[in-house]
Amino acid sequence: MLSAAHRLRDGATFREAIRRGRRAGRQTLVVHLLVGEPVASQPARVGFVVSRAVGNAVIRNQVKRRLRHLAREHVSSLPGSAVLVVRALPPAANASAAELARDLERCLLRVGAEVTG
């Protein structure tokens, strides 16, 4: 699971990352990455948005758990104080963990290439 220090819970920061961050989308999800000034005391944080359009509460929680597990593998590669928001789209409800992993990796490569390039 994703550690508590890496979880994003502040609504204002969610909105800022979605409005000002770099965006990449695939069929099952959209990723927003906001890279700010590196702060040594603040690690990269990851937040998730899974709306009712994805499915009922059981399905939404299942999708969130899968995404949290997948994001755990990538959080160490994010720059310090970066904010990553992963927004699940309705097809994520029927996607396998492998499909979600593939889409997340491709989105991260796209926003990462834009940030460093």
From Swiss-Prot:
InterPro entries with a match to the protein in the record: Ribosomal_Su5_D2-typ_SF, Ribsml_uS5_D2-typ_fold_subgr, RNase_P, RNase_P_CS
GO molecular function: 3'-tRNA processing endoribonuclease activity; ribonuclease P activity; tRNA binding
A single Gene Ontology CC term: ribonuclease P complex
Organism: Nocardioides sp. (strain ATCC BAA-499 / JS614)
Protein name: Ribonuclease P protein component
Catalytically driven reaction(s): Endonucleolytic cleavage of RNA, removing 5'-extranucleotides from tRNA precursor
Function of the protein: RNaseP catalyzes the removal of the 5'-leader sequence from pre-tRNA to produce the mature 5'-terminus. It can also cleave other RNA substrates such as 4.5S RNA. The protein component plays an auxiliary but essential role in vivo by binding to the 5'-leader sequence and broadening the substrate specificity of the ribozyme.
Homology family: Belongs to the RnpA family.
Assembly mode: Consists of a catalytic RNA component (M1 or rnpB) and a protein subunit.
A GO BP entry: tRNA 5'-leader removal
SUPFAM superfamilies on file: Ribosomal protein S5 domain 2-like
EC number: 3.1.26.5
Gene3D superfamilies, sorted: 3.30.230.10
